């Protein structure tokens, strides 16, 4: 379980931002979204393949030399 302790004179929105970041790191949000309802195996494969293609696209984009600015 993720807990956040408020620091002295820390605004609530900053603490909430820290909490959300910690939740994202643990992968809790991703797991909750996956468990909200049944996903058909074909839909799951399609979603995973689309995310893999997007990852490959980003990776290839990073390998390209930067564009000229002039």
UniProtKB/Swiss-Prot annotation:
Any one GO biological process: translation
Keyword Acetylation recorded: no
Top-level division of the source organism's lineage: Bacteria
GO molecular function, one term: structural constituent of ribosome
Entry's Gene Ontology cellular component terms: ribonucleoprotein complex; ribosome
Presence of keyword Transmembrane: no
Keywords: Ribonucleoprotein, Ribosomal protein
Entry-linked Pfam families: Ribosomal_S21
Family statement: Belongs to the bacterial ribosomal protein bS21 family.
Name this protein carries in UniProt: Small ribosomal subunit protein bS21B
Lineage of producing organism: Bacteria, Pseudomonadati, Pseudomonadota, Betaproteobacteria, Burkholderiales
């Amino acid at each position: 379980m993720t807990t956040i302790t408020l620091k002295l004179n820390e605004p609530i929105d900053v603490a909430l931002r820290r909490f959300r970041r910690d939740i994202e790191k643990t992968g809790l949000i991703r797991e909750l979204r996956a468990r909200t309802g049944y996903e058909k195996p074909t839909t799951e494969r399609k979603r995973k393949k689309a995310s893999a293609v997007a990852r490959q696209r980003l990776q290839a984009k990073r390998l390209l030399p930067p564009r000229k600015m002039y």
